[in-house]
């Protein structure tokens, strides 16, 4: 089973599209407040609306340890696509909370659960 974070974003939505075209099971973490609009538009753009229902959405957050532990159960592959990109100094705390603390949470829980295969999406903004 594959666990993916950031599935409601641009890159994560494309990853979910590819996963939905395969037979392997997967779960996607999404925040309660997140919109599925980008993801739905990506599927629609590729004429794959019928595949959207294959997504097993898990409500949670990368800064919510309990939701991560629960969601990652029975997974053997993690695809971490969640993150915030901003060049604004006003976003410094959000960037730290999500991109540093959230990523550490995801990786630590993956290690604790024995998930040994990880794909990690980042950007030049991380530099």
Tell me what each language-model feature is:
Residues 25-27:
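Short beta-strand element of Class I
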Residues 92, 101-127:
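Conserved Rossmann-fold NAD(P)-dependent oxidoreductase catalytic core, especially the SDR/UDP-sugar
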Residues 2-23:
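N-terminal Rossmann NAD(P)H-binding glycine-rich loop of SDR-like oxidoreductase domains
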Residues 45-98:
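NAD(P)H-binding glycine-rich loop region in Rossmannoid oxidoreductase-like domains
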Residues 5, 29, 78-82, 118-124:
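SDR active-site strand-loop-helix element
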Residues 30-50:
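Glycine-rich phosphate-binding loop and adjoining beta1-alpha1-beta2 segment
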Residues 34, 83-87, 123-126:
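Active-site proximal helix/loop that lines the substrate pocket
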């Amino acid at each position: 089973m594959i666990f993916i974070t950031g599935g409601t974003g641009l890159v994560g939505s494309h990853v979910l599209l590819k996963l939905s075209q395969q037979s392997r099971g997967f779960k996607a973490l999404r925040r309660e407040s997140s919109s599925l609009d980008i993801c739905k538009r990506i599927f629609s753009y590729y004429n794959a609306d019928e595949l959207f229902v294959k997504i097993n959405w898990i409500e949670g957050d990368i800064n919510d340890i309990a939701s991560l532990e629960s969601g990652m159960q029975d997974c053997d592959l993690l695809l971490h696509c969640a993150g915030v990109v901003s060049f604004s100094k006003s976003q410094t705390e959000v960037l730290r909370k999500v991109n540093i603390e959230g990523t550490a949470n995801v990786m630590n829980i993956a290690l604790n659960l024995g998930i040994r295969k990880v794909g990690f999406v980042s950007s030049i903004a991380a530099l």
